[in-house]
UniProtKB/Swiss-Prot annotation:
It comes from the Bacteria. PROSITE patterns: CB, TYR_RECOMBINASE. This is Tyrosine recombinase XerS. The gene is xerS. The lineage of its organism: Bacteria, Bacillati, Bacillota, Bacilli, Lactobacillales. It comes from Streptococcus pneumoniae (strain ATCC BAA-255 / R6). FtsK is required for recombination. Site-specific tyrosine recombinase, which acts by catalyzing the cutting and rejoining of the recombining DNA molecules. Essential to convert dimers of the bacterial chromosome into monomers to permit their segregation at cell division. Required for resolution of chromosome dimers frequently formed by transformation. One of its GO terms (molecular function) is site-specific recombinase activity.
Length: 356
């Protein structure tokens, strides 16, 4: 979603919210939470407060009038009723064969509410230096997570990774084979952004950065000589990330056409651009997700940009057998998150079994 559209939608949602949600928004903006995260949270609050009005828990006329006391006095039974409402409301689910939203969606909703409650009961300060209230009903609400061993998760993910020669094969496919399948009109559209698309995908595969980190890169953040990019990690921390050498020609090809193709001015600082009505804009995450899905589905299997991050991490662990190195590359504080890659690269275990 383009930044301008995202901010417009955020403003519309903010106009609906109670004052304490607006305070929460400002507080999290200072952390900083990304606008995308805050937008998703505001959507969840809109859903929750709409239910509060519909269920009669509050007799306010509109969401913005719902008093803070409603959240303070919300019972565990009330919150469980909201969860049941989500499970049983079919219109919330695009798949009409299901009765309600998925458990993943419910967990996301509860996560947003937990964040709001934590702010109101622990983080915010009133004039006396105390939180607005102390009772946090969300601490009493259980969430159900999908039970799956690391080995099972690794096996599922492995099918959606471009390991070994498939990394370069994927890029070669986009560059050489994909255009041969296109109509003249589709080919013209493809050629307009070919170098940019290849540069983005090559960078994701060669660095393992998150999608948000990639789209927020500025031109000055790329050191092509050293093959290093400076990114803003989760929590606003700056980090320097090494980029594998195979991405260099794709980045060079894009930079060679960037200014002329996208009609840039000195004020256009974003590394990856898109043209909208003849005006260059920073490419948004949604556009990259669609692009990766399209190319990957044609090549092998439909994947998300996050699977390209998993691809880099798995290849790096396979080459080094170092969880510490992989953790540093991905920007993780501990090696626990990288345990997954030791299960994906399990040739030693399989070889041992084969020798029995």
């Amino acid at each position: 979603m383009k930044r301008e559209i995202l901010l417009e939608r955020i403003d519309k949602l903010k106009q609906l919210m109670p004052w304490y949600v607006l305070e929460y928004y400002q507080s999290k903006l200072a952390v900083p939470y990304s606008f995308t995260t805050l937008y998703e949270y505001l959507k969840e609050y809109d859903r929750f407060f709409s239910w509060v009005l519909e269920s009669g828990i509050s007799n306010a006329d509109k969401i913005s009038d719902i008093p803070l006391s409603v959240l303070e006095n919300m019972s565990k039974k009330d919150m469980e009723s909201f969860i049941l409402y989500l499970r049983e409301r079919p219109l919330l689910n695009a798949n009409t064969t299901k009765q309600g939203v998925s458990q993943t969606t419910i967990n996301r909703t509860l996560s947003a509410l937990s964040s709001l409650y934590k702010y109101l009961t622990e983080e915010v300060e009133n004039d006396q230096g105390e939180p607005y209230f102390y009772r946090n009903v969300m601490k009493k609400v259980s969430t159900k997570k999908k039970k799956e061993t690391l080995a099972a998760r690794a096996e599922n993910i492995k099918q959606k990774l471009f390991l070994g020669d498939e990394t370069e094969g994927f890029l070669t496919y986009i560059d050489q084979e994909h255009p041969q399948q296109l109509s003249n009109r589709a080919l013209s559209s493809f050629n307009k952004n070919k170098e940019r698309d290849l540069a983005i995908i090559a960078l994701l595969l060669a660095s393992g950065v998150r999608l948000s980190e990639a789209v927020n890169l500025d031109l000055r953040d790329l050191n092509l000589k050293m093959m290093v990019i400076d990114v803003t990690r989760k929590g606003g921390k700056r980090d320097s990330v090494n980029v594998a050498a195979f991405a260099k020609p794709y980045l060079e090809n894009y930079l060679a056409i960037r200014n002329q193709r996208y009609k840039t001015e000195k004020t256009d600082t974003a590394l990856f651009l898109t043209l909208y009505r003849g005006v260059p804009n920073r490419i948004d995450a949604s556009s990259v997700e669609k692009m990766v899905a399209k190319y990957s589905e044609d090549f092998k299997v439909r994947v998300t940009p996050h699977k390209l991050r998993h691809t880099l991490a798995t290849r790096l662990y396979d080459a080094t057998k170092s969880q510490v190195l992989v953790s540093h590359q991905l920007g993780h504080a501990s090696t626990q998150v990288t345990d997954l890659y030791t299960h994906i690269v399990n040739d030693e275990q399989k070889n041992a079994l084969d020798s029995l």
